[in-house]
């Protein structure tokens, strides 16, 4: 499937320190070590509604990582999926009296437009689950052949499940205890009470065909894939075993990322599906997580339709640290709009203070677990000096403008 158009990224002189990120599995900030080509997979949207600021904050996080890698001179192989086979999509389509494929196409196109507006760099491969059925079936066949999966004893609906004990290391990614896993599994799409399962935490790989649901033919019977195996199969096909970063929102730590890692590890015998597991915090409104199910969404398209500059939306989301759960508000947006106006005024000056030190500080802060609050504060200090005292460097404004564009994705 076609991705969206890429915004140009200015090339900067020099470089910054090695990128260090918090790894969910290791529970610490540590260096991100890659080869000449850095590999990253980020879980994409389920396209049944418009992009809200919680989505945007997640994809901005991995856009920052992409930009730090480009600044370091790396090639980046970035893959993102679209979960266009999932119950929420089918339920929304049924509610609205629309074909689920048409709904998915419409919302995916809106998402692409939102990402373009926010100047999020596109993935090299942007992959629908429906485009990946063959590789999903192949992966399930491998798990069945190895004993990592089984078919439940149900003549009517012989679903295929993953054995949670198929790998010795299951649970390392989240670090959760069994009680927490069981609770989250039930809350986030699992089916612990399904009769015939060997373990209540065994995850669905293939849902046998039901009346009124889309299905595809497979050697183990017609049906459709489970959620987690879609991502496992796409990663193995597009990037191979052992990627540098698997990413998404913190609500994907368990069960989704734990299981997608375990599925791949069960057939590759690798100890770690990804060298870094990176998760972005949740965005709230009025004290609650912003979510489609709660209905408290602030949508990117809604803000831009009101005339809000997408650069201000981006700055507002970058004002908080990516791992922190944080709230969006009218005050956050107003602060971002004021900051954007000051920055644009400063870089347009005919002369300003030297850009060298502030660019170095921004690089250093971003390399330290994407510390955007301090990076933005460093730029604020330069802007304050430029507006108050001017300077003697005629090239400084353009240099800061290019650095803000290249490293933060904000166009001044």
UniProtKB/Swiss-Prot annotation:
GO biological process terms, alphabetically, are: cysteinyl-tRNA aminoacylation; mycothiol biosynthetic process
Q: Name one GO cellular component term.
A: cytosol
The EC class name is ligase
E.C. code: 6.3.1.13
Q: Give residue numbers for sequence motif 'HIGH' region.
A: 45-55
The cross-references to Gene3D superfamilies, in alphabetical order and at most eight, read: Anticodon-binding domain of a subclass of class I aminoacyl-tRNA synthetases, HUPs
For activity, the cofactor(s) needed are:
Zn(2+)
Chain ranges for the short sequence motif 'KMSKS' region as given in the UniProt record: 289-293
A single MF term (Gene Ontology): cysteine-tRNA ligase activity
| Residues annotated as binding Zn(2+) | 43, 231, 256
Task: Give the record's cofactor note, including how many are bound.
Answer: Binds 1 zinc ion per subunit.
This chain's function reads:
Catalyzes the ATP-dependent condensation of GlcN-Ins and L-cysteine to form L-Cys-GlcN-Ins.
Into which family does the record put it?
Belongs to the class-I aminoacyl-tRNA synthetase family. MshC subfamily.
Self-association and partners: Monomer.
Q: What is this protein called?
A: L-cysteine:1D-myo-inositol 2-amino-2-deoxy-alpha-D-glucopyranoside ligase
From which organism does this entry originate?
A: Mycobacteroides abscessus (strain ATCC 19977 / DSM 44196 / CCUG 20993 / CIP 104536 / JCM 13569 / NCTC 13031 / TMC 1543 / L948) (Mycobacterium abscessus)
